[in-house]
Structures are given as structure tokens and as C-alpha cells.
Amino acid sequence: MSITKEFDTITAISTPLGEGAIGIVRLSGTDALAIAQSVFKGKNLEQVASHTINYGHIIDPKTGTIIDEVMVSVMLAPKTFTRENVVEINTHGGIAVTNEILQLLIRQGARMAEPGEFTKRAFLNGRVDLTQAEAVMDIIRAKTDKAMTIAVKQLDGSLSQLINDTRQEILNTLAQVEVNIDYPEYDDVEEMTTALLREKTQEFQSLLENLLRTAKRGKILREGLSTAIIGRPNVGKSSLLNNLLREDKAIVTDIAGTTRDVIEEYVNIKGVPLKLVDTAGIRETDDLVEQIGVERSKKALQEADLVLLVLNASEKLTDQDRALLNLSQGSNRIILLNKTDLEQKIELEQLPADLISISVLTNQNINLIEDRINQLFFDNAGLVEQDATYLSNARHISLIEKAVQSLEAVNDGLALGMPVDLLQVDLTRTWEILGEITGDAAPDELITQLFSQFCLGK
């Protein structure tokens, strides 16, 4: 984005397109008030107090035609999200009216905002750092209240503060090394000995490794668990999916092979988003369409974080059952013995002891599945600790891992007896990597790519 483009006054519809009670068209930039005033009949928006809502009408300045009756919010820089003048036009919801107002604003001199450009301006103007900007997107995409809690904490600056404090400590250490090298005669500056540098780098490494330990939980809460429901045809997989969803989304019949594809749905299990994948029954078949579904099922099984293997308690184990037991061995697997409301014929002695007996028909023990998921992935601990900072973003996790590797290189060098001044490079690299997380040292291409993932109007 060019410098000129960054200072344009931008506009976009900030509410989802479609019918609704309210639509919002947003403006941000130096000329936001003047452009809004040029299509507004009511109070002079350039003279009203900041953070006020003003009643009036949007008109076409060429024809004088009234477009809509509106409420206009005026917010003056720097006390706005973008730290620029911001105007929000609250219209009646609807595709036609919001689009008409948007086109009027563009004709009056505003530029159509790019995806995420309002948040990008907040970042460029110092209102938020990169982790906080990403948290805005996480709040929008949060599927559960727990995921939203983590995102809100990140928006509040908890991760930024931890990273910035660590970077400052590393910078202090680097400065001390520099002074010792350049001004060895200064007695009032503590000497950065090998032992002291090892102590400091181990402290930094321990802090970052502790943060990495939160990544598994944070990533699950942010992105969800990819969960494959597997089993031979007609054991109750689709019925289980519907039971967990509490609505009929999959085809449920008594005919084997009716689920010919992979069906995906999200469900909230005690704050954990599960991406449920109801797979076609895995069996040998001559039906080409069903064969494709079976292959997709095997792929879903390989990629799943969690496997729910459904067996039929009212029938003896089949070769297909045994094949699935072997295929899913070693994965995070929960074996579900369905149809326990019927006479049981399955050979329990051939199955692992930690299975869960359920009846999808009567809802028996369905709650135990939720408890087992909590046990498998969270060791029965609370999902979100109130004061903890969580890593949940893959970009952050990758950069923290690289920072730890750089610190390990410093410690390896110290163990080999390398001089302190030669280890500055790796310590400086650690400082730079952490800066990429907050955006202090992030390349322009990365920033552009990140904000392009946002929706229009945000």
C-alpha cells in the first residue's frame, strides 16, 4: 500500500450484507466528516461534539433524493479505533440501502476500504500491535465462549506485555554485553560473565517454553478439534452426529451406505469447538461413489485430532470392526459401544477396557463422551485459567519456537566455551523474532498478508 493510499479516507459496510434491523457504513480518515456531511441532511457534522449520535437523512447531493433516515455517530481523532476521524452511518438494514450509501460516499471522495484496512490503520497508527489486531479477527471467528475469552485477553494486551517485557530484558542484556566489549574500563557496569549470560538466557528460554506449553490448549480452543466419527456402515455414526449437534444434519436411515461423503459440523462441547466429521462407513464396496466417500473417510481419520470409533453392541465384532480398531490405534481415540439398549452380543473381552457404552437412541452416557474429551486433551483441568496467557495463533507459536532455538544456540555456544561477544548474534536474533510477533520487526509483506484475511469493514 502506498503512503498516499494509507492517508486516504476509506469507507466500507461494516455489517453483514443482507436483510437486518440495522446496517452500518463506516468512514475513517481526515476527510471523513466532510464527506459524510456532503450527503447528510441534519446537524453540521463538522461542528458537533465528538462521540455523539446525530439524527438526520442521507441524501443524494445531485438530486436531493432522500436515501434513508439515519443516525450518524461522529468520533474525532485520536480517541477512535483507527486514531483517525471516524463516522459511522447507522441505516436501516438491507442490501440496497447500504450499498447506495456506500456508493454515494465513494462518489464524494472516499475510497473503498480493503479487507481489514480499518484494523490495519489502528495498527499503523499505534492503537494496537499485531497480536491485538489478530485478536480482533479471533473474536470475530470465535466459536465458543472460551475461545472468545482467550481472544479478549490477547486484545487487552496480555500477550503483548509478556513479549515486550521479555524483549526489553534481552535488550538490556545485549546492552550490557556491548558496554563490556566497548568500554571494559567502566567498573560501575556489571561484567557479563559466561555464568551470568547462561543464567539470563536460561531464564528467557524457560519463560518462552512455559508459554509454548499453553499452545496445545490455546490452539484447540481457537481452531477446534478435528473429530472423525468412524465405524462400519449402520452402527449409528450419523445418529451420534445428530445427537451431538442436537439437530438433524446428516441422513439417518436403516440402509447401509447412505452417508456417501464426509459431513462436517461444529459443535460446542463444554467450551471446546469440535469439528465433527461424519465419515462414510469404511468397508469394501463396488459402488464408485461410495468408494470415493470411503477414501475420504480414511483421509479424515489420518488428519483427525480425535477419533470417535462407533461399534454396534448388538452384533458380534466383524473383520471391519477389527480393521478399524487397528487403523485407529495410536490416535486420540474414544471407543463408543452403541445400541446398548438392545441385547448385547459383542465380545467385550476383545475390546479395550476404557470404552464407553452408549445408546444414541435413549441418550444414555452421551455426557461421558464430553468428560472423556476433557480428560484426553486437558487432563481434567479447567479449560481457561483466569490469569494465564495462552498461545493460540500458529504464527505466534512458530515464532516462539524459533526464539527458543536461538536461545538454545546461545547456551550451546556457552557450553563450548565461546566468548560472550560472539553469541550476541543469536541473542539479537531472539530479540528480532519476538518483535515479529508484536509487529515491531515484522516485514511489510507479512503485515499486508495478515490484514488481507480480515473481512471488509473491519
Curated annotation (Swiss-Prot):
Binds 1 potassium ion per subunit. GTP binds at residues 234-239, 253-259, 278-281. This is tRNA modification GTPase MnmE. Mg(2+) binds at S238, T259. The gene is mnmE. The keyword Magnesium applies. InterPro entries: G_TrmE (IPR031168), GTP-bd (IPR006073), GTP-bd_TrmE_N (IPR018948), GTPase_MnmE (IPR004520), MnmE_dom2 (IPR027368), MnmE_helical (IPR025867), P-loop_NTPase (IPR027417), Small_GTP-bd (IPR005225). The keyword Protein biosynthesis does not apply. It is an enzyme of class 3 (hydrolase). (6S)-5-formyl-5,6,7,8-tetrahydrofolate binds at R26, E88, R127, K458. It is found in: Cytoplasm. Belongs to the TRAFAC class TrmE-Era-EngA-EngB-Septin-like GTPase superfamily. TrmE GTPase family. The lineage of its organism: Bacteria, Bacillati, Bacillota, Bacilli, Lactobacillales. Residues 224-378 form the TrmE-type G domain.
